[in-house]
UniProtKB/Swiss-Prot annotation:
Family: Belongs to the archaeal Rpo11/eukaryotic RPB11/RPC19 RNA polymerase subunit family.
GO terms of biological process kind: DNA-templated transcription
Protein name according to UniProt: DNA-directed RNA polymerase subunit Rpo11
Keywords carried by this UniProt record: Cytoplasm, DNA-directed RNA polymerase, Nucleotidyltransferase, Transcription, Transferase
A GO MF term: DNA-directed RNA polymerase activity
Pfam families attached to this UniProt entry: RNA_pol_L_2
Species this protein is from: Pyrobaculum aerophilum (strain ATCC 51768 / DSM 7523 / JCM 9630 / CIP 104966 / NBRC 100827 / IM2)
GO CC terms: cytoplasm; DNA-directed RNA polymerase complex
Catalytic function, reaction form: RNA(n) + a ribonucleoside 5'-triphosphate = RNA(n+1) + diphosphate
Gene symbol of the encoding locus: rpo11
Localization (cell): Cytoplasm
Length: 92
């Protein structure tokens, strides 16, 4: 059984997203923030983890153009593409 990501949207509008991910630390958000930081449509992106025993990550994203969910989708697609390329490099 795969783990379920538990997200609580704290704020969402046409240019800004703030959420809390329960049970998450750096593993998910470090690469996501890295890829979003390279997106020219992103004004800023950050995440913070509360006390390590709590394992809650807080994520904030503000975009200049488009909407924050589209920016996340682009970043996730880029991450998946890079992982597929890495996999081909190892197993081809």
């Amino acid at each position: 059984m795969s783990p379920v990501l538990r997200l609580e949207i704290l704020k969402l509008d046409d240019k800004y997203l703030e959420l809390k991910a329960k049970g998450e630390t750096y593993t998910l958000f470090s690469p996501l923030v890295e890829y979003l930081s390279n997106d020219p449509d992103v004004e800023y992106v950050q995440f913070d983890v509360d006390h390590p025993l709590q394992e809650n990550a807080y994520f904030k994203l503000k975009v200049k153009r488009g909407n924050p969910l589209e920016a996340i989708q682009r970043a996730v697609n880029a991450i998946l593409s890079d992982l597929e390329e890495l996999e081909r490099g190892f197993f081809s």
